[in-house]
């Protein structure tokens, strides 16, 4: 994950309070008080300064002025967007609902990152948990321009949300803002519809179809909602498979069929939502392809989430880095790792050298969305130039033996989903033999991002993070990630291997890097919660804080953790069906595998106190338990 997500700068921020939501609520204008208050900045603040309900910050660059608004009214003005600052207000919204955030922007001589309106929310620890921004950003000198975004505020969000206008520190120019609004939208009755088959293609074997309902459990009960999958068959007769929503959690309705029973080639599986009177409320279809034989060429993901390279199982174990130069690769290849993710897109010579050292490369094409500064630096100014850039890179490296995957998103929010999905689709079209991978810290949004990736990587970094979340945030976020993808997508998770002080310079005296025990514990938390790969952040970040912790020490910690994980990879990749294991103890992670007939169990204590971890194993008569030290990890064979 790119630390660029922290550096927004100028922000006009409003904080929102959230309560419960109705998924089928009318999206017409909310009869409640319009949001935000004083949206046109017409009412002056105390002593005639600023605007009532708003707090203005930022080096004296923010002011309000009558006659500068859209119709000669009042506008909020930032005289120098490059000097940053923000304006904030508290507002009230409901979690579990989608909102349209809109406003009007005028600019003069804006260069660099551009100007937009931003909306974000926080988690229970006070950290930003999700964000969205209007796209494309407003650049140059413009007349009043309406901008808008749509954002889903997850049910788990706290009562703090931000509405703002972030720009990067590299932006310059002047900007005006007027008439901001936050409007609730209607929740569609049927949400994401996917299968657990890689790219919805399979020749045989069980395939599970998953659908998310846009209804609360109360609405499911009150309206008698239920569903059915209409599945085509080899014989030409469609089958209706009843699917009842879980009364406790209707967010996943599923059905499993044998892929061999589907007609050859592409066909459509349909999900129909039915109410208690038998009336069809809504329907949605999914294109699925039954192939003539299993596809094994290149890099693919099986239905357990395990990666395969030309048919052989593979567990990605690597790190982010800045550039994969020969000097860096010489050093990195001496560790236990089998892949790397360099932000500076490698040259052919660098790819060749990585391959000669036995390393796979996740190729970075994430910074090519028009409107981002990094895209502008590459000469990308519109969506056509995005496509040209991605096409050129993919065609150049799609057949390279070092290529593992395409990295296409580094923390961009749901407001980018159409373009993220378009890039994923383009990568598949140009290169059907390698998956796309993304990094995403806004875990509550991941289900909405499903069209935009093949493999997900979420990246909780709890050690000395703002809000001081517990180290068990790794466990919590990975569980949310797994649920967000219906357990049907591979997770190459991203452990913290850096000191936050390298990115929050103002807090550097309050931060530290994770210890070896913490790095080890976080890695095993990820795996215990279902990770199919680990790509730590970041090999190159240690230089920033080497005055506190030597680079050699951080490298040693990363290698010790990596060696331990590497030693268990043959077990992770076993094709034998593993027994289901369920933690009984709160705040603990467990997972089981079966290899050569033996059952292997992983138990993790994600706390700084000793803990007895109790768990139940499918097929075992009695619950079992292991005693773990603070941050303890146990991995061993368990017998009936």
Question: Model-found features: residue ranges?
Answer:
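Extracellular and organelle-lumenal recognition/adhesion modules and their flexible linkers in secreted
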Residues: 26-252
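Bacterial N-terminal signal peptides that target proteins for export
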Residues: 1-14, 23
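Surface-exposed, short loops/turns at beta-strand junctions within beta-sandwich domains
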Residues: 259-265
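Glycan-processing catalytic domains of CAZymes
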Residues: 200-217, 271-276, 280-640
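Low-complexity, Ser/Thr/Pro-rich intrinsically disordered linker/stalk segments at domain junctions
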Residues: 157-158, 266, 613
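Hydrophobic core positions of the immunoglobulin-like beta-sandwich fold
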Residues: 90-91, 259, 617
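Bacterial Sec-dependent signal peptides at the C-terminal "C-region" and cleavage site
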Residues: 14, 19-31
């Amino acid at each position: 994950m790119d630390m660029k997500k922290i550096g927004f700068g100028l922000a006009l921020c409003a904080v929102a309070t959230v309560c419960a939501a109705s998924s089928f609520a009318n999206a017409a204008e909310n009869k409640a008080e319009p949001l935000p208050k004083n949206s046109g900045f017409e009412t002056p603040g105390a002593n005639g300064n600023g605007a009532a309900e708003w707090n203005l910050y930022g080096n004296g660059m923010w002011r309000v002025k009558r006659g500068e608004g859209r119709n000669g009214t009042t506008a909020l003005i930032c005289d120098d967007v490059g000097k940053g600052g923000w304006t904030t207000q508290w507002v009230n919204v409901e979690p579990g609902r989608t909102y349209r955030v809109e406003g009007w922007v005028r600019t003069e001589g804006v260069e660099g990152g551009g100007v937009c309106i931003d909306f974000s929310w926080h988690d229970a620890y006070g950290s930003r948990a999700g964000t969205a921004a209007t796209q494309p950003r407003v650049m140059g000198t413009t007349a009043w321009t309406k901008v808008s975004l749509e954002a889903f505020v997850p049910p788990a969000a706290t009562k703090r949300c931000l509405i703002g206008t972030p720009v990067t520190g590299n932006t310059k120019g002047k900007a005006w803002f007027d008439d901001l609004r936050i409007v609730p939208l209607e929740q569609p009755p049927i949400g994401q519809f996917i299968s657990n088959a890689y790219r919805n293609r399979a020749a045989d074997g069980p395939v599970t179809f998953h659908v998310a309902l846009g209804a609360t459990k109360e609405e499911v009960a009150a309206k008698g909602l239920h569903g059915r999958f209409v599945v085509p068959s080899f014989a030409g007769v469609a089958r209706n498979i009843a699917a009842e929503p879980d009364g406790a959690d209707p967010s996943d309705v599923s059905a499993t069929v044998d892929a061999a029973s589907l007609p050859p080639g592409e066909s459509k599986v349909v999900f129909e939502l039915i109410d208690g009177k038998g009336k069809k409320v809504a329907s949605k279809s999914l294109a699925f392809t039954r192939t003539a034989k299993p596809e094994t060429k290149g890099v693919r993901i099986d239905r357990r989430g395990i990666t395969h390279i030309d048919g052989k199982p593979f567990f990605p174990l690597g790190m982010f880095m800045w550039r994969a130069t020969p000097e860096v690769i010489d050093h990195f290849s001496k560790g236990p790792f089998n892949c790397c993710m360099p932000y500076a897109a490698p040259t052919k010579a660098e790819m060749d050298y990585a391959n000669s050292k036995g390393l796979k490369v996740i190729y970075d094409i994430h910074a090519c969305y028009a409107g981002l500064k990094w895209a502008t630096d590459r000469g990308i100014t519109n969506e056509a130039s995005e496509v040209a850039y991605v096409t050129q890179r993919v065609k150049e490296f799609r057949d390279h033996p070092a290529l593992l995957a395409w990295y296409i998103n580094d923390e961009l929010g749901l407001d980018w989903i159409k373009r993220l999905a378009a890039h994923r689709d383009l990568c598949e079209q140009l290169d059907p033999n390698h998956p796309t991978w993304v990094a995403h810290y806004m875990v509550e949004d991941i289900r909405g991002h499903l069209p935009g990736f093949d493999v997900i990587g979420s990246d909780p970094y709890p050690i000395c993070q703002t809000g001081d979340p517990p180290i068990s945030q790794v466990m919590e976020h990975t569980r949310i990630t797994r649920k967000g993808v219906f357990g049907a997508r591979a997770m190459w998770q991203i452990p913290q291997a850096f000191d936050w002080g390298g990115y929050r310079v103002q807090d550097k005296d309050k931060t530290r890097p994770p210890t070896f025990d913490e790095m080890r514990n976080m890695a095993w938390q990820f795996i215990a919660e279902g990770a199919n790969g680990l790509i730590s952040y970041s090999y190159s970040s240690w230089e920033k804080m080497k005055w506190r912790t030597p680079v050699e020490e951080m490298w040693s910690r990363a290698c010790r953790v990596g060696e331990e994980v590497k030693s268990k990879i043959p077990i992770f990749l076993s094709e034998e069906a593993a027994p289901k294991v369920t933690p009984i103890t709160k705040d603990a992670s467990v997972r089981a595998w079966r290899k050569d007939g033996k059952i292997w169990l992983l138990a993790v204590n994600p706390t700084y106190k000793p803990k007895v971890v109790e768990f139940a194993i499918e097929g075992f008569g009695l619950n079992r338990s292991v005693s773990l030290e603070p941050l303890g990890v146990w991995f061993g064979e368990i017998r009936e």
